[in-house]
Regions:
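Acidic/glycine-rich C-terminal interaction modules and beta/coil loop segments
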Residues: 1-91
Length: 91
C-alpha cells in the first residue's frame, strides 16, 4: 500500500515517537492494538487519516475520527526515516 515510496519487501527504519510531528509523512502506526502498518498520516481535530501511497487504486485512505464511538484506537509507533532492500531482492 506504500509502493510509491517503499518497495514491497523493503525493511523500514522507524524513528520512535508518539505524536505526528509533520502531516503527510510516513509513520508506522498500530491500529486497535493489533495491526501495524505504514501510511502517510494526517492529523484531524480529533483523529487521524491514514493515507496509502500506492500505484494500486484499491488502497484507499481511512479516517479515524475519535468523536465516533466505534472508532478503533490508533497508536503512533514512529516516523519512517529510511529503508533498505533485502540482499536477495531482485531488480
Amino acid at each position: 500500500s506504500m509502493n510509491r515510496i517503499l518497495p514491497n519487501g523493503c525493511l523500514a527504519l522507524v524513528d520512535p515517537c508518539t505524536e505526528v510531528e509533520r502531516d503527510g509523512l510516513p509513520y508506522a502506526v498500530c491500529v486497535n492494538g493489533y495491526d501495524a502498518t505504514i501510511k502517510r498520516v494526517r492529523k484531524l481535530n480529533n483523529g487521524f487519516v491514514l493515507e496509502p501511497d500506492s500505484t494500486d487504486p484499491t488502497y484507499q485512505s481511512k479516517v479515524f475520527n475519535f468523536n465516533e464511538p466505534d472508532t478503533m484506537a490508533i497508536t503512533i509507533i514512529g516516523r519512517v526515516v529510511f529503508y533498505v532492500l533485502p540482499t536477495d531482492w531482485e531488480f
